[in-house]
A protein has these predicted regions:
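Long extracytoplasmic/lumenal interhelical loops at the membrane interface
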Residues: 146, 268-283, 287, 291, ...
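Perimembrane helix-loop-helix junctions
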Residues: 52, 56, 210-234
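Transmembrane signal-anchor hairpin modules in multi-pass inner-membrane enzymes, especially those
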Residues: 1-90, 111-122, 126, 174-181, ...
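Aromatic-anchored transmembrane helix interface
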Residues: 67-79, 88-111, 123-132, 154-166
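Transmembrane alpha-helices of multi-pass inner-membrane enzymes
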Residues: 45-46, 345, 369-417
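Alpha-helical transmembrane segments of multi-pass inner-membrane proteins
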Residues: 25, 116-147, 155-222, 246, ...
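A membrane-periplasm/extracellular boundary helix in multi-pass inner-membrane enzymes
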Residues: 199, 223-268, 283-291
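Hydrophobic transmembrane alpha-helices and their immediate junctions
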Residues: 312, 333-374
Length: 417
């Protein structure tokens, strides 16, 4: 049975059970319905406020926790300041609400600490594997019957690619479990995550796969397998061959599209393609930042300020809601300071993991942090990074989860029998 149904005894059992349910389903749902992730995060924040005000538990944040929480909070504070500096103000409440996930660590980390060390992270990793398997099957049905690029439940192919990459990678960390069921879910979950990446046609996510492989080599070199390397090699090879066969059409289609876009750029015939549109947005963003590097334009004026820097004949052909680069987006929103605080926030999971005492918990936290940061930085340099209803809660929740356990924690299997 799954340990989610059997929290420890004592006064913290109800909170522990609720924590387990929240963490487990948060890991399952991103590719199926990201709105539920936002709901889980918001509900956890409200519960945290209630429990702190009624003294059911204390804030209980270490010096390292506070450093991470402050690093997370500076980014939204700078963005809110930029919103107030730059009119119009009609969207101020909406933007403040959208930035709330980045403050959540102050509330959900003390709540997570009501569960025993080593309980929540294994639940999340198992949930990620299960979620990726279900999401992949959903994506496969879309490709077979409906869509050119799979979206699963995300309504955005690029978002599915990022989620598949990150949560598939997280799922594979469970291959070291002593339980064969968890090992199978880990391998299938990783393969399913890669399948989602391929079926979504998210080219920026393809770039992250080699980086993740290096992270896995570092992590698994330090920790023994309960699965024989021969079995792992055979299973992995078969799954890899199956994924390539399944996704070859999508891979070739996306490569051909990129080649066509590059050929159009060389011809300089004025045709606006996906690639030329992004390059135009980058140029417009750099030009806009150079004109107001101190305060930026505020997120409410983001695209208007970029489009104002582009020729009149190109503007109507760029129906994008973001610049396709997270760092340039932060620079437009709040100037050079915006880029700096974004970079700081991206470092917070690594800071939280690195500052733990040595042990299995620290190694796992570092692996999670590296998977998280590399996924966001690389894909976010070519597409979506933050200010997105799914990616913001995922980042905030994972940062809290990374900080939750001590570095010396030993993790037990979730499946007990």
């Amino acid at each position: 049975m799954i340990a989610i149904l059997h929290p420890g005894n004592g006064t913290g059992s109800t909170l522990d059970r609720n924590n387990g349910i929240a963490v487990f389903f948060f890991a399952i749902l991103p590719g199926l319905s990201p709105n539920f992730n936002s709901f889980i995060l918001l509900a956890s924040m409200v519960s945290g406020i209630y429990c702190l005000t009624t003294a059911r538990f204390s804030l209980n944040l270490s010096k390292s926790d506070r450093l991470v929480a402050i690093g997370m909070s500076i980014y939204p504070l700078v963005m809110i300041a930029s919103i107030f500096i730059n009119p119009p103000y009609s969207e101020v409440p909406d933007w403040i609400f959208r930035l709330l996930p980045f403050f959540s660590i102050w509330l959900i980390l003390p709540r997570m600490r009501q569960s025993p060390d080593g309980r929540l992270v294994p639940l999340f990793i198992l949930g990620a594997g299960i979620g990726m398997i279900i999401t992949f099957l959903f994506s496969l049905l879309q490709i077979m019957f409906l869509m050119e690029r799979a979206e699963a439940g995300t309504s955005n192919a690029a978002l599915l690619g990022i989620i598949g990459l990150l949560f598939g990678g997280i799922a594979l960390l469970n291959v070291q479990s002593p339980r064969s069921v968890e090992q199978r879910i880990a391998i299938l979950g990783y393969a399913a995550g890669l399948g989602c990446v391929l079926l979504s046609g998210t080219r920026s996510a393809w770039l992250v796969i080699p980086v993740h492989i290096v992270i896995f080599l570092w992590y698994f070199r330090k920790h023994s397998f309960h699965l024989s390397l021969r079995s792992l090699a055979i299973t992995g090879s078969l799954l890899f061959a199956g994924l390539i066969a399944l996704g070859s059409g999508q891979i070739l289609h996306r490569i051909e599209a990129l080649q066509a876009n590059m050929a159009s750029l060389e011809r300089s015939d004025g045709e606006v393609t996906s690639l030329s549109a992004r390059l135009a947005l980058y140029k417009g963003a750099v030009s806009a930042i150079s004109k107001d590097p101190l305060t930026g334009y505020g997120p409410q004026n983001r695209m208007a300020s970029v489009l104002a820097e582009l020729p009149d004949n190109i503007r109507p052909q760029l129906p994008y809601s973001h610049v396709h680069n997270g760092f340039l987006t932060a620079g437009i929103d709040a100037g050079v300071l915006g880029i700096a605080v974004l970079s700081l926030m991206l470092l917070t999971p690594l800071i939280g993991a690195w500052r733990k005492e040595p042990g299995p918990g620290r190694d796992l936290a570092i692996a999670l942090a590296l998977l998280l940061v590399s996924s966001y930085v690389i894909t976010g340099s070519f597409g979506i990074m933050f200010n997105q209803k799914a990616l913001d809660p995922i980042f905030a929740y994972l940062v809290a989860l990374i900080c939750a356990d001590r570095g010396s924690t030993n993790f037990a299997p979730v499946v007990r029998c």
